[in-house]
Amino acid sequence: MIHSNEPLPYAIEYAKSGRSNCKTCKKNIALDQLRMSMNRPSTFFDGNMDSWFHYNCFWIKMIRGRDDINISSIRGVDWLRWEDQEKLRQEIQHFKTASPPTLTPLCSTTTVILSTIKTEKSLSNRGKCGKCGQNFERGEIKAHNKGKANHFKCFLQEFDKISGTVEDIPGWADYEENFKIKAVGEYVEALAAKRRSTEPATPASASPTPPEAETPVLSAEGSPESSNKRPASSEIIEIDGEGNPDENDFAKKRRMKKEARLMEVQKKRMKKQSDLLWEYRQIFERMPYTDKISILRENEQDIPEGHDPTAQVIERLVDNALFGCPIICQTCSNGKIVYNSSCRTYVCTGYATEYSKCTYESKNPIRTPFEVSHRLTEKHKLQDIVFNQMSERLYIGEEDGESVVKIDKRKSKGGTRGEQFIYAAEAFDSTNNVPIKVGDLTSTNTHIIKKGTVVDAKFALADRCHVFKNEIDGSLYQATLSFTDLTQNKNSYYKIQLLKDDQRENYYVFRSWGRVGTEVGGNKHESYSNSNEAILKFQDVFHEKTKNDWIYRKHFRKMPGMFSYVETDYSEFAQITDTEITPGSKTLLPKSVKEVVMSIFDVENMKSALKSFEMDVNKMPLGRLSHNQINLAFEVLNDISDLLVKLPIDASRILDFSNKFYTIIPHNFGMRVPEPIDSFHKIKEKNNMLNALLDIKFAYDQISGGDVPASTSLGIDPVDINYQKLKCIMEPLQQGCDDWNMIHQYLKNTHGATHDLKVELIDILKLNRDNESSKFKRHIGNRRLLWHGSGKMNFAGILGQGLRIAPPEAPVSGYMFGKGVYFADMFSKSFFYCRANAKEEAYLLLCDVALGNVQQLMASKNVSRQTLPAGFQSVQGLGRQCPREIGSYNHPDGYTIPLGLTYMQLQGKQDVDYHLLYNEFIVYDVDQIQLKYLVRVKMHHARHL
């Protein structure tokens, strides 16, 4: 079982100091005073924070109907004195059952109408009646009046008259039979008592029988019962159609008594356990801290670290002293077993892998006896203290099964969401609703570019500092760290920069941290007068957070529970030069070519395209993640894909690889818990995201410098510079020419039956990529002009590098016929891969594809260049709807254009029906592809039917 380590929403304890103040009354909470907290997400770090209250002030803060609480949602109950545990349970019971006065209009009347009262079943025997103060029986009927829960008998005593029968009580049928019998008897007695109290004022001629409307018990014939005595149980049960009621009632009473005895025994044992725990606590609290640590070490137990280690040391000593010492974890072999008050169970402190905690848990693990050395026994006079008195920890069953209440967490704020940080995606899933506000890449609200480096704008002196460089190798003293753990709902970043003043010999080690995609976080800095001290501090912080040495970061190894180093590429910022030329103002390129170049190299367009993938663009300067980092992420997806085909699915390893992926490619989930990558659909989405990142990185690298030296680009329009970098000639087709008309006809004729689509043809550019024609394998024949759709942001990479096959690191899952380049003979099929919105332009390619001999397949099959059967050069996935061959056009350049009207093929081949709606053509060698046309269309509407 994978347990969640998310903090519980509430906590209770005896104040460990006298320094905290109550959040309600603002007064001091004294040392050892009982206090409660509301645990909510912090605004200062990626985690939760306790807001403490006096015990009574906490319950004033809680509002019925808005807040919910139960024992399972409170941390620390196990460590309270027994009387305080009982006090807490009664308070919770009162909070849950009591009703506001405004909801009990009966309190000001002397007549109770049974059909309008509020009742419920007592969930335990701990609650007490608001009138007589006696405990309820478990399962007993409780009636509410004036905000208090009463016995049904006590409730009836509050009124002068009773209107209705017990069967009128809402939910009457849901109560247990023995308590219904008891309630009927109490009801009859109450009626008789009220009648006797009014008898002196009753005329002699009046009937002694209550009015029919107030008679609760019916005879077997259905007539009112005239006797004033409590009716026999057999008569009452007979009303409900029960058979042999005496025997049934006896058995139920016997069972109830047995359960009550067992509950009483369990309660006494729990009290004993609590008293012993508290006795041991008092012993260990008197010891010096060094002696406590010595005892833990003697018993081969871990020494707690982190927040409030002293309290954790005492709790572990107390637990071990009473029950014995848990042995080392047998699941991961590197962690110790400790009691977790939030989970109400024992968990492992170790890590199964460098990315995931061990998921071991047990209510009562295997233990060894707890021992104290002779020296410490003599020193603290422990000779008369008996340890290891209980072999198993006891739990209250009904509380152990309760679910933790759900609390509305504070949601991610909009705008520029906190600290600048490099991360790739919002959630990149169909359920994410976190809004994205696209900011300006060069805005000082995000970062400041100084001397080819990016200075964190949160630093107060950022405008007069730059990132310090190593004088030997030129590397920058800055690090971006990431940590994601789904079980703890952690999605953290940590940034370190060593900054130098532009003018003076002043150095600053600046740190910022928080939760990715939110304003949660903080920052700090230290000042130094020389570089050596600053470098040592920078290296110390890096080692503290990662347990790796800075000088060996190129061989970084992720350590369990520590941050991971996110490898980033800042080289493009060193090449950015200011230009006074407005892009497009001086170029002599044709208008349509200029528009395409400006579009595919426009940073804002890249951001808008990334937004469609729900990627965050405010804190990810484009191109920052390195190729190596992206390839590592591909490998993780491949590992997850391999896990999903093996049954049963290993949920722990899925969790581990998900943590690893989100750590390598930081995502923004806001305050939501990161989702495991546990399906092929999610793998495909993440795979598409990584491919998009590669294309954007290529485009931005071209913008930042590419192959054109900055010295030769002075005075040249940026559009011309970027066009040269593409090394792809683009020539607009004359509207109305033969090729234009032919392509327009191809576009109109090949709309799929399942696609509701309306587009407008804007422009067609003829393409000629540098050296592509010379490599093109036209000799294998069977050339066709086929469609290929892609997001606009990918076109700088496509035009500059050609269409490419997915890298070896990418998973095979998501590709119906293996890793290759996919084409279609249906315009509408390829169009949906463009991810365009209404009124936006989309770009599609028409490619001359040398198919050669085609292997035709009816269903999915993993194919590669190496596994293609001998004599075949491509694969065709056969679809039901396709263009008629009779309408194809043989172009003078040597390829066929399948622009015929489409038709439905009614019968499959070789007795196998069609799995695909439309044809797919796949080649596994990029030299079988030659880009011919870029088609610009404007979308009016598009949807799948």
Curated annotation (Swiss-Prot):
It is found in: Nucleus. GO terms for biological process: determination of adult lifespan; double-strand break repair. Its EC number is 2.4.2.30, 2.4.2.-. Residues 258-397 form the PADR1 zinc-binding domain. Its main location: nucleus. Disulfide bonds: none annotated. Residues 464-563 form the WGR domain. Keywords: ADP-ribosylation, DNA damage, DNA repair, DNA-binding, Glycosyltransferase, Metal-binding, NAD, Nucleotidyltransferase, Nucleus, Repeat, Transferase, Zinc, Zinc-finger. Inhibited by N-(6-oxo-5,6-dihydrophenanthridin-2-yl)-N,N-dimethylacetamide HCl (PJ34), 1,5-dihydroxyisoquinoline (DHQ) and 3-aminobenzamide (3AB). It is an enzyme of class 2 (transferase). A zinc finger (PARP-type) spans 10-96, 117-183. Residues 237-248 have a biased composition (Acidic residues). Residues 586-704 form the PARP alpha-helical domain. The keyword Disulfide bond does not apply. One of its GO terms (molecular function) is NAD+ poly-ADP-ribosyltransferase activity. SUPFAM superfamilies: ADP-ribosylation (SSF56399), Domain of poly(ADP-ribose) polymerase (SSF47587), Glucocorticoid receptor-like (DNA-binding domain) (SSF57716), WGR domain-like (SSF142921). Zn(2+) 2 binds at residues 329, 332, 348, 358. Residues 717-945 form the PARP catalytic domain. Belongs to the ARTD/PARP family. Poly[ADP-ribose] polymerase modifies various nuclear proteins by poly(ADP-ribosyl)ation, a post-translational modification synthesized after DNA damage that appears as an obligatory step in a detection/signaling pathway leading to the reparation of DNA strand breaks and programmed cell death. Involved in protection of the genome against mutations. This is Poly [ADP-ribose] polymerase 1. It comes from Caenorhabditis elegans. The lineage of its organism: Eukaryota, Metazoa, Ecdysozoa, Nematoda, Chromadorea.
